[in-house]
Amino acid sequence: MIRRLSRAERLAAGRRAARRRINTEDRAWSTHSSDKPDIGLRLMAVLRDLHRGLPGRTALRALSIGSSSEPQLPILQAACRGGVTLLDIDTAARAQVRAAVAEQQLARATAGPRHGPVRTVVADMGAVLADPRAAAALRHAHLEGQRQHLVTFHHSLYYLPRAAWDAVVAATYHELLAPGAAIHAVLMSASATGPTTTTALYARWAGACFGARNDQDLAAFGRALRRRRALPGADVRIATSTVYFDHDDFGTFMGVVWMILLHPQVHRFSPRQQDAVTEWVYRHLWSRGEPLTQRQDHLIVTRTRR
């Protein structure tokens, strides 16, 4: 499949996309890639394990951290009669969730008694999970003092430096997880090398323009947790999957590219750099009908019952 735009059209589309809010690109990614079904399948497996391991009448409680509009909200709410809390620094994402909840009447459980309420919290996950004391304060201030049965980091650890992961995961594990509960994290694999992969795209452009090196290796982090036994009583599992993204609209395609390149939250590409990225993506991917390929790692940390 060959797609064509004039140079002026494609550069204008690339610059427009670079100005959009990240939650817009997040919606495009979750709607038009196979990421949502991939995470959904893994998430349902985690939930099944939780139901098997916990007492039968347990009303599960879940906390989704930094995942913007949380495309897995219907799964979480159906499974968690004790409620779902969405924590994000993005106020636009919070408003989007509130609108969806109101429209679908999820918070009032009109779909049936098995559906729990949805709450939103605006906070910086790096601050509220910086250490056990901060995490305990979050639990008492926003989670009614209750520990959670599931905490998710779905593509949200991108926005924390790798050096912060150990403290954030440890604080979550010790202060937010109930016995028998689990953490489910998902992140782009740091080791994929194919030319159409999001990993290679990031290495090429964030590396060339900012000297960035992707040290956010979730699989290696999980292996280190398991090897060091850093979380007492933890069962650590790692899996890797492949997802694809494509869209006939070049502006939408470029919006997802900017999200992957962490523009402008982490790396602010200049207009000239934006044009260079746009031209490369047009020539090597979109005009040829090549989808973006993402290898992504899943980390599941379960706190054994004690």
Model-derived features with residue positions:
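Conserved Class I S-adenosyl-L-methionine
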Residues: S68, R229, G233-R306
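Conserved class I S-adenosyl-L-methionine
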Residues: G180-R213
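Short alpha-helix
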Residues: A212-A230
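A short, conserved alpha-helix within the catalytic core of class I
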Residues: Y159-T172
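Class I SAM-dependent methyltransferase SAM/SAH-binding core
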Residues: R61-A134
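Class I SAM-dependent methyltransferase Rossmann-like catalytic core
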Residues: M1-A59
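A conserved beta-strand element that flanks and buttresses the S-adenosyl-L-methionine
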Residues: T152
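Short catalytic micro-motifs in class I SAM-dependent methyltransferases
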Residues: H155-S156
